[in-house]
Amino acid sequence: MGQRVAEVQRKTKETDIKLILNIDGNGDYKISTGIGFFDHMLQLFSHHGKFDIDLEAKGDIYIDDHHTIEDVGIVLGQAFLKALSDKRGIKRYAHVILPMDEALIMVAVDISGRPYLAFDVDFKLPKLGDMTSQMVVEFFKAFVWSSKTTVHIKKLAGENDHHVCEAIFKAIGRTLKEACTIIDDRIPSSKGVL
């Protein structure tokens, strides 16, 4: 099995993004999006998933954070899809229930080739630091669509929006790491393709 690394670039009139992803990394990261809270969430994702991420994103954040966060989701999803190649040998399915103080988050993943997001999380505040709360779901929509992955994210408990969001990014990192784990040399589908 070769190294599962992907490099993706995306340049539009709104954003300029460069990403290198190593699925079989150590959780090393160099992340810069211009949105501090979002950087922190991606760092947690990298650390808890043990994905090496080198990400530089420049966007029109003088307008708002929408284009940058959504496009990072697109690029990260494309990188996972590219790095996993034909998905030979991966576990494919994984789930985790993760606490962060009073917050409790459930995440389940199927690296199926079929994009679907079930996002059952409410945030009380309009902003998380310098990040718009609504952009959490938009990030995951973009990631799921471009990675062709089914993801369920459900808040089981939680009062503090920061804790809830941290738990989500930690949980998705851990869940994807498990789903990407190599367990044999077969395509994990009765169809023979994902």
From Swiss-Prot:
Indicate the secretion signal residues. Answer: none
Name where it's found: Cytoplasm
EC number(s) for this protein? 4.2.1.19
Q: Which GO terms describe its biological process?
A: L-histidine biosynthetic process
A Gene Ontology cellular component where this protein is annotated is: cytoplasm
Task: Show the PROSITE patterns listed in the entry.
Answer: IGP_DEHYDRATASE_1, IGP_DEHYDRATASE_2
Q: Which GO terms describe its molecular function?
A: imidazoleglycerol-phosphate dehydratase activity
- Superkingdom of origin: Bacteria
Kindly give the InterPro entries that the UniProt entry links to this protein: IGPD_sf, ImidazoleglycerolP_deHydtase, ImidazoleglycerP_deHydtase_CS, Ribosomal_Su5_D2-typ_SF
| Catalytic reactions of this protein | D-erythro-1-(imidazol-4-yl)glycerol 3-phosphate = 3-(imidazol-4-yl)-2-oxopropyl phosphate + H2O
Q: What class of enzyme is it?
A: lyase
Any Pfam family matching the protein: IGPD
List the pathway annotation: Amino-acid biosynthesis; L-histidine biosynthesis; L-histidine from 5-phospho-alpha-D-ribose 1-diphosphate: step 6/9
Q: Which UniProt keywords apply?
A: Amino-acid biosynthesis, Cytoplasm, Histidine biosynthesis, Lyase
Family from the record: Belongs to the imidazoleglycerol-phosphate dehydratase family.
HAMAP family the record matches: HisB
Protein name as annotated: Imidazoleglycerol-phosphate dehydratase
The taxonomic lineage of its organism, from the top, reads: Bacteria, Bacillati, Bacillota, Bacillota incertae sedis, Caldicellulosiruptorales
